[in-house]
Amino acid sequence: MLDWALWFAHNGWPIFPAHGIVDRSCTCRKGPECSSPGKHPDTRRGWKDASLDPRQIREWCAKNPHANIALACGNITVLDIDGEKGRQSLESLLDDDRAAYLRTTPRARTGGGGWHLFFQGVEVKNLVGMKPGLDIRSRGGHVILPPSMHISGKRYAFDRCPTKHKLQKFPKWLLKIAKDDKPRIQTVTLLSGEPVDIDSIPVIPEYRNNTLTSLCGKLFRRGRTVEEISATLMAINEARCKPPLDASDIEKIVWSVSRYH
């Protein structure tokens, strides 16, 4: 793990430690009760602690040798393809030329069966549900990098390794979709199948943090997972907060509230 962490840093991929997986359990204090095992930061400020300093990275790895590696997105933009739904959404957007271009940039398979496509950084917001199962991770967001361990027992793994494939520019056609001003999410469906109607929530011009923090607590009390809550708050923030909070602020709200649930 250390060798890969040092490679990422040497090649300009800003990283920070995320909690790891040991014996099918998160290394955080919640252990097997963690609702986002192996995916959340093991530093106080999360992506803001990301570093390219090999000394810092060695220190992190020595402190928690089981830590996963998290990429602080921004200088690198990631297309997050969530399982079969995401694959189908992406395929519906592709022609032969687009598909061929995507095959030239680094790609990793996630431990949960999805994919991450890595591109040169571009000015674009973090987007949850740009299309069903398709998210964009940019500044303020993060993804877990190979060879980190997933709760499934599988490791994240590159099938197009950045040691051989250079980061390509973020596709213009995908950027156009990402910057479309039309609402991208009207409903978020929780894993339980329960829909959250975004349009039923009034516009939040002020007290955004308090409103989203209150909603976050309600969702935790209803037994929702960190992933569900993050997706819901991101969608509400994008569609109903005027102006929207930074993605890092949403992440901070979720992790702050999660300490009490």
PLM regions and their residue ranges:
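Metal-dependent DNA replication initiation modules
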Residues: 1-3, 9, 17-18, 64-65, ...
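Signature for HUH/AEP ssDNA processing cores
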Residues: 1-113, 122, 194, 206-208, ...
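Modules that initiate DNA replication and primer synthesis
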Residues: 9, 14-17, 24-25, 114, ...
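Charged, low-complexity surface segments at secondary-structure and domain boundaries
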Residues: 40-48, 76-78, 154-165, 217-218, ...
